[in-house]
Amino acid sequence: MLIIVTYDVSTETRAGRKRLRRVAKLCESIGQRVQKSVFECRINLMQYEELERRLLSEIDEQEDNLRLYRLTEPAELHVKEYGNFKAIDFEGPLTI
């Protein structure tokens, strides 16, 4: 499944800046950054539930905003892409 993760973490305080770094690092570990606070993640249901749990443990619900969107498959029918962005093909072979 394709998940879109968006967040807006308050950075008014040192704790907020730490939360922002932790949320971004967590998203980077499982998905691909497409904008500053937007990630695309191709994951299964178990990974989705774990990601949601971990993200909710990081944010401050009084200060921050987190949105998780599950796109209907096939995602290619629901996502239109314009401009200069080079997506990584997670389904294809990995060259190191």
Curated annotation (Swiss-Prot):
Keyword Ion transport: no
GO BP of this protein: defense response to virus; maintenance of CRISPR repeat elements
Keywords: Antiviral defense, Endonuclease, Hydrolase, Magnesium, Metal-binding, Nuclease
Sites where the protein binds Mg(2+): D8
GO molecular function terms listed in the Swiss-Prot or TrEMBL record: metal ion binding; RNA endonuclease activity
Database matches in Gene3D superfamilies: 3.30.70.240
Top-level taxon of origin: Bacteria
Pfam (any one): CRISPR_Cas2
HAMAP family reported in the protein's UniProt record: Cas2
Job description of the protein: CRISPR (clustered regularly interspaced short palindromic repeat), is an adaptive immune system that provides protection against mobile genetic elements (viruses, transposable elements and conjugative plasmids). CRISPR clusters contain sequences complementary to antecedent mobile elements and target invading nucleic acids. CRISPR clusters are transcribed and processed into CRISPR RNA (crRNA). Involved in the integration of spacer DNA into the CRISPR cassette. Functions as a ssRNA-specific endoribonuclease.
Oligomeric and partner information: Homodimer, forms a heterotetramer with a Cas1 homodimer.
Protein name (database record): CRISPR-associated endoribonuclease Cas2 3
